[in-house]
């Protein structure tokens, strides 16, 4: 295909060629230590062979054909080099000290504008050592994006999602809710759809709860430790198949609490008869355990369970231990409560302490028991079942006999006294 060029376009091209020759002479004088004949011989056939394929291959090969790059920069990919001089319609294939070869692409009058627009970027990447090293580093990190623009685009377009615990219900057909317990998504080795399966539970990544990872510098300052740990462990997904952030921002579920299997609960200690003595120390109702029953009491298994102190409600996961009393303790406490009027008064403090020491319960437990068993105040304690109450005032004299015996006793008192006097006289 032939293109018609006007005279003013040819004049502009000649001026550009002269300017380029002067610039390249200066560059070659400043960086002649990087130019080698072997590199030039290797790059010229590449340009000549790629010129017949397509304009894109022309641009790729032309970016490599400049003899100003050091030999150790062969890691730069063609796509990165092409991005350093994107869309240029006026490309130089190779230049020697005495000859120059020029490749022209169809562009017409826009050649001068594109040449002027992309000249700083081309000189910045290919002119000096620092620019070449920066371009190679960015091209390797950005995955072929090339140049500063490619690196920034890869970092800006990468989705910042973090996939946490698996929410797949494995018992949905049965009408139940069963989770597998997977705490975080781990990508499987491989490419494509195989990488979207969790290596821990085998479920697809869409079953895992998704949350935004690091969205702003403010969040980095709030939690730098967690962000660095996540980046080190590779928990942030950077796959190209992920949905952009703005597309699903309205579909995020406001999960305020973790799933039931992720919530931390206090350990539940099983309460058994063997561990009952150990649980007495944690009881909120008493300080002293009732003494063990002797084997002579056959009704020891019929001990009633009474309510304990309700000062502070215990936790829902821990069963509160209730104080157990024997039948003898209940009868003695009932008899004592009848004597004091089912209330503990301050004047009776000494008697209450003495009774608690005898029965084997604390004052607090006795007070709670009297409060919970006020309904027993209507029925007095039975005299047959209760033991004899301890006498409050000890009287050494025996009880007086009945009246008729007392009269008979007075009637026979003088003979007894007389007999005692006779015995003393005989002695």
From Swiss-Prot:
The annotated regions of Low complexity compositional bias extend over 50-60, 271-283, 301-312, 417-427
Report the stretches of sequence that form zinc fingers (ZF-HD dimerization-type): 163-211
Q: Which UniProt keywords apply?
A: DNA-binding, Homeobox, Metal-binding, Nucleus, Transcription, Transcription regulation, Zinc, Zinc-finger
Q: Where is this region: Disordered?
A: 1-60, 91-118, 264-320, 375-427
Q: Which residues bind DNA?
A: 318-381
- Report the GO terms under cellular component: nucleus
Per the record, where are the segments of Pro residues compositional bias? 380-401
Name the Pfam families for this protein: ZF-HD_dimer
A Gene Ontology MF term for this entry? zinc ion binding
Basic residues bias: where? 402-416
Q: What is its biological role?
A: Putative transcription factor.
What is recorded about the protein's domains? The homeodomain differs form the typical one by having namely 4 instead of 3 extra amino acids inserted in the loop between helix 1 and helix 2.
Under the subunit heading, UniProt states: Homo- and heterodimer with other ZFHD proteins.
What protein name is recorded for this chain? Answer: Zinc-finger homeodomain protein 7
Q: Which gene encodes it?
A: ZHD7
């Amino acid at each position: 295909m032939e293109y018609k060029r006007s005279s003013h376009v040819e004049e502009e091209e000649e001026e550009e060629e002269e300017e380029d020759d002067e610039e390249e002479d200066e560059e070659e004088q400043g960086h002649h230590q990087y130019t080698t004949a072997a590199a030039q011989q290797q790059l010229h056939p590449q340009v000549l062979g790629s010129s017949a394929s397509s304009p894109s291959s022309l641009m790729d090969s032309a970016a490599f054909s400049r003899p100003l790059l050091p030999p150790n920069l062969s890691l730069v990919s063609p796509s990165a080099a092409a991005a350093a001089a994107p869309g240029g319609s006026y490309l130089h294939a190779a230049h020697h000290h005495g000859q120059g070869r020029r490749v022209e692409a169809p562009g017409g009058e826009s050649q001068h504008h594109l040449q002027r627009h992309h000249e700083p970027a081309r000189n910045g990447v290919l002119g000096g050592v620092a620019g070449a090293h920066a371009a190679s580093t960015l091209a390797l990190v950005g995955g072929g994006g090339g140049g500063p623009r490619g690196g920034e685009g890869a970092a800006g377009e990468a989705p910042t999602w973090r996939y946490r615990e698996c929410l797949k219900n494995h018992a949905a057909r049965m009408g139940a809710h069963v989770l597998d317990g997977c705490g975080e998504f781990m990508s499987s080795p491989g490419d494509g759809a195989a990488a979207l399966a969790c290596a821990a539970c085998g479920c697809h990544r869409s079953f895992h709860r998704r949350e935004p990872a690091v969205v702003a510098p403010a969040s980095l300052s709030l939690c730098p430790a967690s962000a660095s740990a996540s980046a080190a462990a590779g928990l942030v997904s950077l796959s190209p198949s992920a949905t952009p952030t703005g597309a699903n921002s309205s579909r995020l579920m406001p999960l305020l609490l973790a799933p039931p299997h992720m919530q931390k609960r206090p350990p539940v200690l099983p309460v058994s008869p063997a561990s009952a003595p150990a649980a007495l120390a944690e009881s909120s109702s008493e300080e002293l355990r009732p003494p063990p029953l002797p084997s002579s009491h056959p009704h020891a298994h019929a001990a009633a369970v009474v309510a304990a102190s309700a000062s502070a409600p215990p936790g829902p996961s821990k069963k509160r231990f209730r104080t157990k009393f024997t039948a003898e303790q209940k009868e003695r406490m009932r008899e004592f409560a009848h004597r004091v009027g089912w209330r503990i008064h301050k004047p009776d403090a000494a008697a209450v302490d003495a009774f608690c020491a005898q029965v084997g319960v604390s004052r607090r437990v006795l007070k709670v028991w009297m409060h919970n068993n006020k309904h027993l105040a209507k029925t007095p304690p039975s005299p047959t079942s209760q033991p004899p109450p301890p006498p409050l005032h000890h009287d050494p004299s025996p009880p007086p006999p009945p009246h008729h015996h007392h009269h008979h006793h007075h009637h026979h008192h003088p003979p007894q006294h007389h007999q005692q006097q006779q015995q003393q006289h005989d002695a």
